[in-house]
């Protein structure tokens, strides 16, 4: 009983410290709302093999179609299995990294985000970012490459990522590292 209680507290702590915007699970997602989604593929993420294989998951689709909900559901499942997990909006991530750089703590902050087994970066490309921010994101993605899993949500197709970062070469470098060993969930449409 005591071991079970300790385990429950540890799981609760993992979920609480992950910073999820809400606590929604796979059971809360209405797959009939998104008939183009491969439900089997999405539910297969519950087994968390993608973490063991250091694979990424990228959700691409219009605003309001459930990308954040699904990314959060996967993250909650990972945290419940005691994998270090963190959720952050892309603009907040870049702002935190820039603040750390101005305080001469950039490497520490970069390492902080790089160490999570699962890092969820929400809304990549919702707002464009300057070259400094794009370089910081590249450094983070590069540091995590083939070491940990990253989950991305974006409303921009990959062919338009150069618009986000204002640099074709940098966009290609980020995409190269993200897309290698990735599960890409496309065609999330707003009905």
Which residues fall in each region the model found?
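Conserved P-loop NTPase "ATPase switch" module shared by AAA+ and STAND
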Residues: 113-129
């Amino acid at each position: 009983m005591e071991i079970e209680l300790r385990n429950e507290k540890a799981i609760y702590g993992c979920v609480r410290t992950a910073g999820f915007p809400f606590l929604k699970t796979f059971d809360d997602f209405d797959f009939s709302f998104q008939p183009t989604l491969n439900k089997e593929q999405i539910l297969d993420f519950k087994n968390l093999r993608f973490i063991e294989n250091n694979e990424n998951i990228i959700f691409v689709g219009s605003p309001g179609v459930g990308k954040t909900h699904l990314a959060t559901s996967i993250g909650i499942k990972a945290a419940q299995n005691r994998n270090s997990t963190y959720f952050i909006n892309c603009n907040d991530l870049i702002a935190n990294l820039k603040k750390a750089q101005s305080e001469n703590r950039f490497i520490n902050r970069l390492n902080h985000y790089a160490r999570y087994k699962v890092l969820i970066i929400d809304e990549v490309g919702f707002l464009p970012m300057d070259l400094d921010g794009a370089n910081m994101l590249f450094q983070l993605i590069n540091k995590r490459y083939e070491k940990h899993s990253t989950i991305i949500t974006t409303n921009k197709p990959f062919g338009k990522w150069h618009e986000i970062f204002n640099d074709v070469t940098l966009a290609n470098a980020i995409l190269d590292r993200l897309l290698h060993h990735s599960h890409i969930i496309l065609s999330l449409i707003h009905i």
